[in-house]
């Protein structure tokens, strides 16, 4: 990657490949900017990096990319993100991605349709996903093996907030 400068939110999201990559560990940040934006990671929430990164790119000022590797990091195999999915982790991920879509819409950031299909819940056993519930706008689709749509229904904002 060559050195690039971007000030527009749409271009910053594109350069950072966000979505789907909401990584915070591949960005160097100025302390003053973090203080100005009041950015903090929320505690006891998984996928908090989605909220953090969307605000960072959407409100953080100019983005400069650099062509060189600046630092390296190691992925912890025992980390929360590498551990087994739980209903709480799935709910946190759903809420984070739903908030991102709302944030993008409020700021006029164009999203590919595939990033508007949000997985609400997955059910699986033995490494096989047998049912996945996906939301797209005001519709929920239940998909067998994440391939075959078997049920669709319209959802209200209250149902989406309650997780039903």
Q: Which residues fall in each region the model found?
A:
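C-terminal subregions of glycosyltransferases and related glycan-biosynthesis enzymes
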Residues: 23, 72-164
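Generic macromolecular interface patches on structured domains
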Residues: 63-66, 110
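Donor-binding/catalytic cores of nucleotide-activated saccharide
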Residues: 1-64, 74-88
